[in-house]
């Protein structure tokens, strides 16, 4: 699916960038990496959850603690609502806006997904257009979004019923 760069702190994961190449993932982090230590052992539990997810455990990513400090209340609400979408299922931007407490804020819901700091972990790939189209996906493009949805559906076939 691509390369992931993780940035964490005492209050949990601060960022996760999923991009097609390592260089793109690092560049996506930008200045957030300034002053960061390279400590792969700090993410042992996160990596374990990612491996379990890739092996078909649709709830594994729910265990990863996230640090939402500095995030607007609407984005926090939208990200939490997105996290509640079960693996193998999709919801519309309209649904997301309503769940975040602002039913008419579909564009803002789209912006919350576009600015998702936690690629894959907040599963914005599960949010699609009301007409069933994929919408957008900054975590590697629409091809990656489609593959993630197909993988989840294959691992959770009861979601298709």
Where are these regions (language model features)?
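Regulatory, non-catalytic segments
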Residues: 104-119
